[in-house]
Curated annotation (Swiss-Prot):
Domain PH: 86-181
Keyword set includes Lipid metabolism: no
Organism: Homo sapiens (Human)
GO BP terms in the entry: bile acid biosynthetic process; regulation of cholesterol transport
Entry-linked InterPro entries: OSBP_sf, Oxysterol-bd, Oxysterol-bd_CS, PH-like_dom_sf, PH_8, PH_domain
Residue(s) carrying N-acetylserine: S2
Ranges where the record places region Disordered: 1-62
A GO cellular component annotation in the UniProt record: nuclear membrane
Organism superkingdom: Eukaryota
Protein name: Oxysterol-binding protein-related protein 6
GO molecular function list: cholesterol binding; sterol transfer activity
Homology family: Belongs to the OSBP family.
Subunit structure, as described in the record: Homodimer. Interacts with OSBPL3.
SMART domains: PH
Amino acid sequence: MSSDEKGISPAHKTSTPTHRSASSSTSSQRDSRQSIHILERTASSSTEPSVSRQLLEPEPVPLSKEADSWEIIEGLKIGQTNVQKPDKHEGFMLKKRKWPLKGWHKRFFVLDNGMLKYSKAPLDIQKGKVHGSIDVGLSVMSIKKKARRIDLDTEEHIYHLKVKSQDWFDAWVSKLRHHRLYRQNEIVRSPRDASFHIFPSTSTAESSPAANVSVMDGKMQPNSFPWQSPLPCSNSLPATCTTGQSKVAAWLQDSEEMDRCAEDLAHCQSNLVELSKLLQNLEILQRTQSAPNFTDMQANCVDISKKDKRVTRRWRTKSVSKDTKIQLQVPFSATMSPVRLHSSNPNLCADIEFQTPPSHLTDPLESSTDYTKLQEEFCLIAQKVHSLLKSAFNSIAIEKEKLKQMVSEQDHSKGHSTQMARLRQSLSQALNQNAELRSRLNRIHSESIICDQVVSVNIIPSPDEAGEQIHVSLPLSQQVANESRLSMSESVSEFFDAQEVLLSASSSENEASDDESYISDVSDNISEDNTSVADNISRQILNGELTGGAFRNGRRACLPAPCPDTSNINLWNILRNNIGKDLSKVSMPVELNEPLNTLQHLCEEMEYSELLDKASETDDPYERMVLVAAFAVSGYCSTYFRAGSKPFNPVLGETYECIREDKGFRFFSEQVSHHPPISACHCESKNFVFWQDIRWKNKFWGKSMEILPVGTLNVMLPKYGDYYVWNKVTTCIHNILSGRRWIEHYGEVTIRNTKSSVCICKLTFVKVNYWNSNMNEVQGVVIDQEGKAVYRLFGKWHEGLYCGVAPSAKCIWRPGSMPTNYELYYGFTRFAIELNELDPVLKDLLPPTDARFRPDQRFLEEGNLEAAASEKQRVEELQRSRRRYMEENNLEHIPKFFKKVIDANQREAWVSNDTYWELRKDPGFSKVDSPVLW
């Protein structure tokens, strides 16, 4: 065995798996062919305890047989109850770390009772210094045999593990499978055990949320339990009705009292069987001997020892949960009426208060030791039965009161449902009327003559020049169009007073994206292609030559139709065979899309282009770097409310353009490659030039999906000759299959000015960890040539970015407010709502490949799901047919508006070929031979 293999072998061996038996080999082959299926609770299983749908499986379904493909490990199968308790297993494995120490790092793991803990060394485990803990029973486990990889997806974090030795890899997989089944079986047998892991502890993080239990802001989400049919989404129900159903749903989910009652009754039944046997023996002895009367014996059993009291008290503590906050007192009779204990007596628990029997009877007339022992045993068991019945009665009474309260509240809410529906209808009509009036007002405003006004915006105070201000000219029309946006000079106190949305997170090291930073200095030939663009675009904007009638200020304020209900879509059936694979090649239902595509998403990054305009008027290079950093952060803020849907994948050759006179830029983009998917864009202004080409990789890990962008963003400020480049960070969407999805960005961004070495900026998008609340945090620093920090940045990518030290820090950027009812319209910002708008004037100026003409996307925006699904299938089939034709004829797709170049790092990059706006002038797209994309 090599030294590396020895380094990762367990410190305390359980059993060395040098040779596996035929049975274990067969089991392993069978395990690799099985996958998890979601099982709905049926009437036949009504007596079983409530279980997460991930824990039960039907018959195995074959997966990929290739050794180099990912395989999902099966969970607990239906009817599988006897899972032997596994032995403790420990040893070293390699864990993939993300930033700042990327790569594989050796960690010591301990697997015990379905919980996988890890730290740097065995001594750390003994000292309690645990880096993290994973509940393998509530995780999706997948393996890759050829690479000896093990991945555990806990919904909020993805753990990548690797073992160098094949023997120890097989051992770890076998042990993890055994512990996983054991842990799932424990949850099945005791469902309340799983509830302990819904809310992570502040001191440790030994759990992750169950697959179909979602906790948000301390409240149970609807449709989070398996036996209930999917609830309608909040979009289609009145708020009061939804609240009532959610309370009933919470009561059904919180079945702790009923579970305890069932457990108590089960123990009670077994004890009653023992009592019956003892009673028969007592009657036999009483007939054969002159035994004393049983009722008289009970009257003498009043002396209770303290030891017996403690035993009884301890036993009762076990049967009654600590969480029970309501204790119902049941009256008992002070006297005991003689009853026949071997007959049925429904009022037994209310009539008899059994006392703990003494260890021996003091009646001198009693001579039979056997008879005395039977009497003592009978009284002790009867005492237990009484306690069990009392506990069960209390549980039922508590649940009865809960149900009565829930039903009364729900009935009360139903009484207002009709009134709420009318109010909602009136509100909708008022909103439509308001939108129409706003549109008319904007048109009137655009036709009026408005002089440009100069506004003053505070810039970062430098250490030597505090209090100075830099002025930048902004048109008054922009102020009116963006009246809801907050001024950048507002007090930083608003940042600290703003309400934060904090989500619970499972244990994890503070790690982020593992893909290397893609930072490159673009070669001089790229710069030369863009040097004259600024002067050209400045002249065209000032002279009003950008195109006949395309400049519009009266833009829409709402989408034609709200987003559809996606609660009935079973994502697991779609994604289960694609764990660890690129999802860009997987066709998804159209209901999961939003009516925008990736090319339009690239344009969304220009929403806060004012930051670049301000940078172009800032003489200080450090302050320019801060503004460019704020622009880099602002591109992520629109994703905060967009985790529930995905953009359309552009087809090869698809384009998009956006001209914004109010912001002073013109933008176009094109899908230049399909496999791999590459989107390129170019944006021009009199103050800056922006371009990028991005390759997207989407990977599904069982409960989460990672989006790994590869590419470089470029900004040129012609006034100062600056040329900035930076990379994107990793994006992860959590809770894909259950609960409420939420999005996270993490990784490092390095911004460099390739034309000057005066300073660089490093931004860190902090990954959520379990020891502090750092959701969506961004930290950064601007460093000079000597490595000294000139400016420090902090904030949150969805709330704002600040420069300096609190509370005297200055706000550099803050996003605008969201439109009314944004949650009903895909979470779109005002800028996003305007991107897919198409009017008759613009229609004649666009190329036929523009995304606005895409039929499936347009039908989805209008709320016609059936037509959208049909058109989506047709568009995808057309693309496949074109690809087959090109492959058969050895043809290569050549983009029309971008060209491929090689940058300074010998990497491929896509830049504009300066033909788009020239062809648009005539307009000349009607004269261009364009492919039929839809």
